């Protein structure tokens, strides 16, 4: 079966909004009898895309003609499509029929050796699908040699042509060198594509220049 994964090592509210819009299309127009999963290591983070989807659903079907929402699920009753959350707090992580997974901020996954109970549960839920889609949208974190580090290493090998994997699509937004962070402010757009339009540009500037600079620069 064709399995597709996207690693997007840059996240913002705009990325969450795009993921929610994509899920909304599936909720109303997707194949019936499927589950869509909003996953993260933390339940609060898993809620972000899920709540955005709920807000869009309310605006499109405010009278709940074919859709509904409770504390844990967003459903299309007519087509039997369910959008739910999955996190480390979820007790039962099996028995799903997932067609698409949105894994948000996977840098928080701190399990050793690149393992992730959440990601594995999602893949098990997609095992019966011919073309499941697993989207991993995250910023960089501080957990070394964990799930995200392993995925980024694999992504770079795919990008550089070391590994031939037609089912793995990676978009990595990062600086070319650490030195350019301090020496070329215009280069920040490489790792923060939205910075030229974002209201937090001043905050980024303050954070970077208030941090201790490497002694080698």
What would you call each of these model-derived segments?
Residues 2-22:
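Walker A/P-loop
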Residues 13-14, 93, 109-110, 143-144:
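Catalytic P-loop NTPase motifs of RecA-like helicase/translocase cores
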Residues 19-31:
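Walker A/P-loop NTP-binding motif
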Residues 34-53:
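Conserved Walker A/P-loop ATP-binding site and its immediately adjacent core
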Residues 115-217:
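Non-catalytic, compositionally simple segments
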